[in-house]
Every structure is written in structure tokens, then in C-alpha cells.
Amino acid sequence: MSMRATFLGTGGAVPTTARAPSAFLVNRDGERLLFDCGEGTQRQMMRYGTGFGVSHLFVTHLHGDHILGIPGLIQTLDFNDRDDSLAIHGPPGSKGHLEQLVHAGGYQPGFHVSVHEVRPGNVAYRADDYEVRAFDTEHRTASVGYALVEDDRPGRFDREKAEELGVPVGPAFGRLHAGEDVELEDGTVVRSEQVVGDPRPGRTVVYTGDTRPLNSTVEVACDADLLVHDATFTDEEAERAKQTAHSTAREAARVARDADVRRFALTHISARYAADPSPLLEQAREVYDGEAFVAEDGQKLEVPYADSDGGGAETGE
């Protein structure tokens, strides 16, 4: 099952010519989940070819660079004759403000939009085989991060063992792999556990939004396939990071290291690094020795299963 992440906006509070405000989209086998919606997000979606079929929008907090794209997105979806509903999720206390954005200027969308508040530790959205969980973050206003966590997958099916046990090739293989026991014509029962290995973990993608480095992020991001973490400043602005409740690249890298994530994306890059963001990555790599990169607008990333190959970062343009 495919999973592709697209960085639509990787800038800080002040956009630059190269970086739009925060927006991050995950396409999981055709279902599109949007995390934050800064100004111009709908144009970024057009520019980078993600499509508009977003089913859920997960808002981390109510600062403008994370939400002011909502009115434009809603109206663009409506003008494109959208029929499907859209669910918007936000931190405690956000519902009224988010509803105002949906109806900015008295606008009444022609499709259903629902707004929900989610508390840290709760599930914002549950699908058949994955869920999106909210977790604690620390910013200057009510905020949450989100973790997309897939269910475990069935273990590997041992076809050779099944044939040795007399299981005929065909539908019985699928039933065994799905966890059912199978009775053969001679009355012998072949148990699923005899031919199926241990469950294999699904994928986890963690998106923090704006935050200080926290143990709660380490816990939820443990062994994650991708961590997208606030890395607004370099060490030289560490005091400012504390004052504004952001993270430095080094602090974010410590979270990535302690959580032992497979890949780590630095985002929410301050405009002061517009000419050269390389110091952020250099400082992060002094702490975290895994695959780390400064996310760029339009960058696309395949998120493979941990037991498969491939999945490196791509550039969108």
C-alpha cells in the first residue's frame, strides 16, 4: 500500500519566495490527509500536483501561518464542485475559530464541513487500518501534534510450509494469511500460526507543528518512519527559540535521535535562513546520524514499510 508525503509549506511565520507557510500532505493509497493549512495552501496543492481530494484536515494550533489558508481552500474546493464532506480537527478550544474560517466573509460551502476538537492522547480519526492520534506539544497557545499510525500487518505467509501441510493452492492460502484456520478434506486442521509469521509493524508518520522539544514527542515518535519536526532556529537563536516556544535544529535532532526514527525532516524554517539553511542541517547531523534533511516546498517522499527497500526523498520541481 503506497504512502507519499508532500511538503506544501515549510516556512516559518514569515513566508519567503521559496517557502510557503506550514502545510503537509500525506497521500495514503489515495486518501489525502492535510496537516495545517497556511496561506496559499490550495495554490501549493495545484503547483505540486497533490489533487484536492482531502478528506481530513488536522490543525496543530491557531496561529495564522497554520490556518489562514482554510478559507481559500474551502472556496476552491467548492468552486471545483466538491461533494464529499471534509472533517477538520483542531486542539481544545479551536472549534469556534475554525468554523469562522470555514465561513469567512459569510461564505456557505456547498459541501459538508465538520469541525472537531481533539485532546492530546485521543484519536482524532480512525480508519479501517490506521488512525491519527493527537499528542502533547508546547507552544504559545493551545496546540497538539499528530501521529498517523498504521495497524500491524499480518506476518509473512510461508507457502512452502503450507504445501507441506497439505493445504491446496488457492483461497485457503488467503484465509490462513488472514488469520483463519483451515480444515482439509481429511479433517486435519491447519492453524494460521503454523504458516504465518509474527505480525509486521505498519508505518508511522509524526508531524509536530510548532513546539519545544518534548518527551511526549519522543514517546509517540518511537521507531517512526518519518518525523516532521519544528526546527525554526540554529543554536545561535536558542534563547529566541525558548521565548517563542519553537525548537532549534539541534533540539529537534535530539528528539529524532532519542525516538530512533528512520527519517527526520526539519521544517518551519525561519526566514532568516532563506539564503542558506545548511547550518540547520549541519547542527542537526551533529546529534542525529540517521537520514535527515531540511524539507523544501514541493518535496515528495515515499514512505515505505520498514521491511521493504526504497523510499528516498525526491524534489517536486
UniProtKB/Swiss-Prot annotation:
Catalysis: reaction(s): Endonucleolytic cleavage of RNA, removing extra 3' nucleotides from tRNA precursor, generating 3' termini of tRNAs. A 3'-hydroxy group is left at the tRNA terminus and a 5'-phosphoryl group is left at the trailer molecule
Record entry for activity regulation: Inhibited by high salt concentrations.
Disulfide cysteine pairs (residue numbers): none
Cofactor-binding details, from the entry: Binds 2 Zn(2+) ions.
Family of the protein in this entry: Belongs to the RNase Z family.
Binding-site list for Zn(2+) 1: H61, H63, H139, D210
Cofactors named for this entry: Zn(2+)
SMART domains: Lactamase_B (SM00849)
Protein name: Ribonuclease Z
